[in-house]
């Protein structure tokens, strides 16, 4: 092993003279190599028996055919036994087992026909032999009395350089395919358990070793999504890199890195791994061999790839510096962000970080516009783009209603919040942060609060904070706003659009919204109750603090109204139907209202005792269809009564009525519906017309089914659709002593006692969470029932409907005003930019915020195009960049480093 750049780079096992040459392609040789071996099976999935070491060695009987032992399985088992022996304090056994494993690997390597795998096996054999030598030297250098207290030498970093697996290109090869970082993929078995210690433990990313300054660092988080979804997201990023090259210069891609963090090795889909293997950014067999004997937490693959622009392989997108981080265990999306921020970003120190969910496809300029927004205004700490439904199916009410909801939320809510300076949530599916704004300083800052649910036990968090951290992105936004001594704000970038898939069935929608609703409710309460920090701790100006105070008053009233949304929806139905049906069809009125209340009660029962699945889908489907029809009938009656000027009388004569003028009637309709459409039209979003009917049909479902299910499952802190099961190299291992039977039995008893204690604690926590759920659910239902009772018995229909109309009017007027002001600011900024452009100032002002090496390449012309040409000697260039002219300091440093390797 030879140390290089703070890590350890494995040698080629040249000392084994008997081993044949691998015959691997070199950077100067052919760069097309195809692996025909199946990769669906990994030897790290083979567990060994949970027995003492001495008993497990019984399979190595003298009469056993030696050839039967010379297999991958035998070598892996020996390495696992050696690692167990080392951890249990039996170094002599570990030395012998490591030596035996190395011998087996050498013999297996001689028979391996695949040259790449042969090289990996020989390299692993060398590392295992080295480990045996290190343990042997340590054992005889430490006095016997101090041997138990002394620590053996730390296991060196297991790292492998792998020639890229490339497709047989049909036509031109990638423009930069001969550069060293394109011809080799690097694999590292990361054993660091705490991502914060990633750099301290000697691990270093390849772009960091190359001396590249990463300005934009993008993460794609994924779980078990298909390869086509990852391909779509990467292509969206590649299109943005192409636009960045037009704006910032040919080498803009060198300042951008992409980290794909996959949550769990056994959870990753086969199609996704196949896609990455086709790119040359994943190799399961090399991962299996290299990680033998290592307590792997993360499998790290690093490669620079180019995606093809078309099926003919005639042109390519700019290179992507890709980091594929495959976590060994499934620990959740937040843990993936923990690796991205605390391990990778803390090492690279990027200027901006961009969060993208796999399957979300950024527009061709969306990422660039997010970054440009923060470049132009150094006060902006975070930005959000528009999340749009990808190809909405208007014939599916579930999808169409979400399309309407997403559009109106962006047009009215995010626009208003952007004008005021605080966006309550920057969605993790597509948003960007200035890393300086969220980075921890001495363990304090927005990021530590963002990850608090990972660093604090569920028992210590409690049910309130546990639900609050289901919306950890909302906590991050508030911590960013209220950061001590700083005046960070947030901004909505309207034309930074990213398209994503949404739940297509009601069952999937219920699962998703349970976490959203509970998290947003408790996170909202947290932000409102801690707003004083904005005045006491933040560095915002007095005028900004006053504006933020008004915004938080608005949010407080909004939270109160959302609490009583269940009862107010029923009261609206009750009064409209009573005024229409009571005098002529009292029986029909009683039946409709009775079924409605019975459905609400049934939803509570189903939500408490069942998870949404196929067996409960029939009830939920009937409920949402019935309540949707009631909603449409009430809407038609209201519109008809307004247009036909029909007068109705409240049957309860003893209640004082409120007069409603024609102006108030027209104003109520205009503010309730007209301002929503007006906001959409001035923003150019005419597609909302195609989904309005579906949204109002689904509105009772959003209020009743989703709301009741959310409050009925406050004890559930999971993400709903993704479990947090763990998956390691095999079955859990029984702790082992030094071979003494009594010690092994005693240790096993201690483990069993610890398991029982943990199980009891888990049961206590679960019971306390369920008690909190039941109490809050009961309080919510009782308060809504009391409100319904008071309104129906003490307030006339005209007074109640007039009150609701005014409340809706005030909120919609505020939202419309914010939407219009946001649009005015946007138009003014564009007009100002155009005017400055004609005077030659705009480009210089924007250019001043860019890195020095980019300023010379900045082009003000929006008509710049990307071209791929061929020089006279047949060599390709990308936007004027000749592959033979890789003369930048970072490229030269990187090329020299790879040649030394």
Curated annotation (Swiss-Prot):
UniProt feature, compositional bias: Basic and acidic residues: 31-48
Molecular function as annotated in GO: chitin synthase activity
A GO CC annotation given for this chain: plasma membrane
Annotated localization: Cell membrane
Induction: Expression is very weak at all developmental stages.
First-listed, main subcellular location of the protein, grouped into a coarse class: membrane
Catalysis: reaction(s): [(1->4)-N-acetyl-beta-D-glucosaminyl](n) + UDP-N-acetyl-alpha-D-glucosamine = [(1->4)-N-acetyl-beta-D-glucosaminyl](n+1) + UDP + H(+)
Keyword hit for Ribonucleoprotein: no
Pfam families: Chitin_synth_1, Chitin_synth_1N, MIT
Organism field: Phytophthora sojae (strain P6497)
Sites where a glycan is attached: 487, 863, 882
Enzyme class of the recorded protein, top EC level: transferase
Family: Belongs to the chitin synthase family. Class II subfamily.
Family matches, as InterPro entries: Chitin_synth, Chitin_synth_fun, Chitin_synth_N, MIT_dom, MIT_dom_sf, Nucleotide-diphossugar_trans
Coiled-coil region(s): none
Protein name: Chitin synthase 2
